[in-house]
A protein has these predicted regions:
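Short, glycine/charged-enriched secondary-structure capping and boundary segments
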Residues: 29-33, 53-56, 104-105, 207, ...
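Short alpha-helices
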Residues: 41-109
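Short glycine-/acidic-enriched loop or helix-start segments at secondary-structure transitions
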Residues: 25-28, 50, 203
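Hydrophobic/aromatic beta-strand patches that form the interior of the parallel beta-sheet core
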Residues: 16, 37-41, 53-56, 156, ...
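Hydrophobic helix-and-loop "lid/oligomerization" segment in the mid-to-C-terminal part
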Residues: 11-12, 92-220, 225-256
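Short glycine-rich anion-binding loops that position phosphate/pyrophosphate groups of nucleotides
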Residues: 20-23, 44-46, 162-163, 197
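N-terminal small/polar loop signature for handling phosphorylated ligands or for N-terminal nucleophile
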Residues: 1-30, 34
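Generic enzyme active-site microenvironment
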Residues: 17, 40-41, 91, 125
């Protein structure tokens, strides 16, 4: 089965960025599409308004909620494929409805999806949240063993370097969703996942269990996101990056 498309297949006439709060989060596509984004559909309050037109609904639990509301306004029929995509986007953005950003409207939308299209949501939930590859389980065991604790155990940090990936022979795609692991430790207020991108570049994912505003913490380091889930990109040696994170989190926790 063939999915997706090759960049050379067509020249896009209208480009939409969904759930992308900052142009730098486009990654490798920044140089290609960065100055060509016609519309951004988002729910991050930290959106930097980089697109020609921007639709941000900060009260939405997920960007796919906003997409769903647009689909209703435009009277677009809900096909099985559309329903699967909307549900998957909502479920993943809300941690399968366990995050604080899950609203009553979020549940209403899912009920409407279920009522109007016979999609097996349980199957999607299992595939997205329960099933793990052998490589993923290896990574989870490894990062749990090397988890670091700071600020009287209020901050936990896991680091996934290129050396770890190479040693374990695990693909980088297995790293998705690791950010929730540090918060599983009792008493932790902020959990941080560091993923090495290149020699002196690290992608930071930050999660908050209580009152710490990780959006503000990450914004102080050039990033952003939600109050409970945010991220940024840091440069330097791993030790320098760790120190920068610890200092920023210490200030963020102190201001709560």
């Amino acid at each position: 089965m063939r999915t997706g498309y090759n960049d050379e297949e067509f020249e896009p006439k209208f480009i939409i960025a969904a759930d992308v709060a900052d142009i730098n989060l486009l990654g490798k596509y920044k140089d290609i599409y960065g100055d060509k984004i016609n519309l951004c559909i988002d729910h991050h309050i930290s959106n930097t308004d980089y697109a020609e037109k921007t639709l941000v609904c900060p009260n939405a639990s997920a960007a796919c909620e906003v997409v769903y509301e647009l689909i209703k306004i435009l009277n677009i029929p809900l096909t099985e494929d559309i329903t699967k995509c909307i549900y998957t986007g909502i479920a993943t953005d809300t941690g399968c409805f366990k995050y604080e950003n899950t609203t009553a409207r979020c549940h209403e939308i899912v009920a409407e999806l279920k009522r109007n299209c016979p999609v097996n949501f349980a199957k999607i939930n299992r595939e997205m949240f329960d099933v793990k590859s052998k490589g993923r389980l290896k990574i989870e065991r490894a990062v749990t063993d090397i988890m670091e604790y700071y600020l009287d155990d209020k901050l936990t940090m896991i680091c996934v370097t290129s050396d770890i990936l190479n040693k374990m022979k695990v693909d980088a795609s297995e790293l998705e969703g690791l950010a929730g692991i540090p918060l599983q430790v009792e008493g932790v207020e902020v959990g941080v996942t560091i993923k090495q991108k290149d020699e002196n570049s690290y992608k930071i994912s930050m999660r908050s269990a209580n009152n710490a505003n990780v959006s503000d913490i990450c914004a102080s380091m050039g990033g952003g996101g939600h109050v409970k889930a945010a991220g940024c990109l840091l440069h330097g040696t791993l030790d320098e990056v760790k120190k920068q994170i610890v200092d920023a989190v210490a200030k963020g926790i102190k201001s709560c």
